[in-house]
Each structure stands twice: as C-alpha cells, then as structure tokens.
C-alpha cells in the first residue's frame, strides 16, 4: 500500500462543517442520500458516514443490504481524524443507526472529539419507530440511545412515539409531550424538537414543538397526505444547516419545516415516490 501513497500533506485536507452519521441507499432519498445534497445546497461541507447501506427502503418488492460492520464503521470515523479533515468541524448529526454497537462506537468517538472541539454541536435524531409502525429498529437500540448518545447531545428531534420510548411517558396530548421533553433536558441537552406533535385534524395541521428549559414554542404547519419517506431526514438536514448559518432555534425549525413542505409538494408535482430537491433557482 505504501507504494500507492500520494497524498500526505494534511494542510491540503478537505474540511467538513458537518459529519452526518446515518443510513444510505443506492436508490432513493432517505438518510444521507437526501441529507447530504440538502446540506450542500445550504453552502456547507458535509462528510457522510453510513450506518447501513441498502439498495432502497423496504417499501419496494426487492431489498438488499444491511448494517455496516463495526470494524468498517469505526474505521470510517477514525479515518476522518487520520485525514485531518475535522479542523473546522462544527456539528455532528445522527439518524438511523444499524446496531447498538454502532451507537457505542459513535459515542466513544464523539467523547474523544469533544476534547478538541468543545463547542461541537451534536444533534441526535433518535430513529426508533413511529405510532403507526411501532419499533422498527433492533430492540436494544432505545437503551443504547439513552445510555450513550443522549448524554452527549445538545439537541434531539424525536417524534411522539420516540419521545414516549425514550422517557417511558405517555405523550399523546401536547402538555404531556412537553413535560416528557422537559424531563430529558440537562446541562448538556439544551433542547428537544418534537417533530410530530398532535395538531388540528380539522384544519389539516401538524405541530412541531420546540422545548427548552426556559421556553416552549409550538409551530403549526400544513399536513400533506403522502407516503414519501425521508422527510424527517430532510428536516434534520435543513435544521442543522439553519443553525450553523446563525438562525435562532425556533426560526431554524420553522424554516426547516417550510422547506420540507416545499420539497414534498415539488416531488408530488413530479409524480415521484422519492423526494426530489428543487434546483436552487426554484428553491
């Protein structure tokens, strides 16, 4: 391998604003397959670390792939430091994780990374399941989130079902959901964005609730009837981009929600089952 060595000047290394750790598909627009282009549209540099590599989501008649082996996963993370590509790192985001062991490996990497990046923003989307499907990850993942990732995160973006799993509390009404979110806050975890709080069914509205120690903001947006997948991944990509571009949290959440609605409508207009990002000229 040494005879192949061409690039050893670390001063020339590409630098990332964000490391995004989540699923990747060959076909489709979920996980990093939608998050990376969305983040890049915002003018930010992102490195994608896959947790699973799949042919497509399981919602098609064929489906191939699986979780990245731990040795590879830890190597992907380690290589970013070996390439000296994290000097300007500002945020790490997590989405769908393949195994509990990946969560532990990631937490160990983040803990070490924090020593050189004390202001690093860690945003965790604790992908566990939803009300309609129940838990759709391996059964040991919720406890791994609680034990390893939540203590490191500054912000998390659970849906109502995931908030219930993480807290053990019923969250089916707004007050209960807010109380559950507040129970997770700590010196490290500064905010919880509940991405699917109950809304006004008659007015076809959904609510996103932004909870911090000193404020609660409820944001209502239109409910779009759709089977599109990856909207949560897109929302998180837009949210972290907005935060890094200087938006206040509630404003960043509001803008991210509007962008997701725009992308969904654009996708429907183009009669696609996979999210399509509008070109910048149309964004």
From Swiss-Prot:
SUPFAM superfamilies: Ribokinase-like. InterPro entries: PdxK, PM/HMP-P_kinase-1, PyrdxlKinase, Ribokinase-like. Signal peptide: none annotated. It catalyses: pyridoxal + ATP = pyridoxal 5'-phosphate + ADP + H(+); pyridoxine + ATP = pyridoxine 5'-phosphate + ADP + H(+); pyridoxamine + ATP = pyridoxamine 5'-phosphate + ADP + H(+). ATP binds at residues 125, 157, 162, 195, 221-224, 231. Its EC number is 2.7.1.35. The keyword Endoplasmic reticulum does not apply. Substrate binds at residues 23, 59, 233. Its cofactor is Mg(2+). It comes from the Bacteria. GO terms for molecular function: ATP binding; hydroxymethylpyrimidine kinase activity; magnesium ion binding; pyridoxal kinase activity; zinc ion binding. B6-vitamer kinase involved in the salvage pathway of pyridoxal 5'-phosphate (PLP). Catalyzes the phosphorylation of pyridoxine (PN), pyridoxal (PL), and pyridoxamine (PM), forming their respective 5'-phosphorylated esters, i.e. PNP, PLP and PMP. PANTHER family: PYRIDOXAL KINASE, PYRIDOXINE_PYRIDOXAL_PYRIDOXAMINE KINASE. HAMAP family: PdxK. This is Pyridoxine/pyridoxal/pyridoxamine kinase. It comes from Escherichia coli O7:K1 (strain IAI39 / ExPEC).
């Amino acid at each position: 391998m040494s005879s192949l060595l061409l690039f050893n000047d670390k001063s020339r290394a590409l630098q990332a604003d964000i490391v995004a750790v989540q699923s990747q598909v060959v076909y489709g627009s979920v996980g990093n397959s939608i998050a990376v282009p969305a983040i890049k549209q915002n003018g930010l540099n992102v490195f994608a670390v896959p947790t699973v590599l799949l042919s497509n989501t399981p919602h098609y008649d064929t489906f191939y792939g699986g979780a990245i082996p731990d040795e590879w996963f830890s190597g992907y993370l380690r290589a970013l430091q070996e390439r000296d590509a994290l000097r300007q790192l500002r945020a790490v985001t997590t989405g769908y994780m393949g195994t509990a062991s990946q969560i532990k490996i990631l937490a160990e990497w983040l803990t070490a990374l924090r020593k050189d990046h004390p202001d690093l923003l860690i945003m965790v989307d604790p992908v566990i399941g939803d009300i309609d499907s129940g838990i759709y990850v391996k059964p040991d993942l919720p406890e791994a989130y609680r034990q390893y990732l939540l203590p490191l995160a500054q912000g998390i973006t659970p849906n109502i079902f995931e908030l219930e799993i993480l807290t053990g509390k019923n969250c089916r009404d707004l007050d209960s959901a807010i109380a559950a979110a507040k129970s997770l806050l700590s010196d490290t975890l500064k905010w919880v964005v509940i991405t699917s709080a109950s809304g006004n069914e008659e007015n076809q509205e959904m609510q996103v609730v932004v909870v911090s120690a000193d404020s609660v903001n409820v944001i209502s947006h239109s409910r779009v009837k759709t089977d599109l997948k990856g909207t949560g991944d897109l929302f998180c990509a837009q949210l972290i981009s907005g935060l890094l571009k200087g938006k206040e949290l509630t404003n960043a959440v509001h803008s991210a929600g509007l962008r997701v609605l725009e992308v969904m409508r654009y996708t429907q207009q183009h009669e696609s089952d996979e999210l399509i990002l509008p070109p910048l000229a149309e964004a």
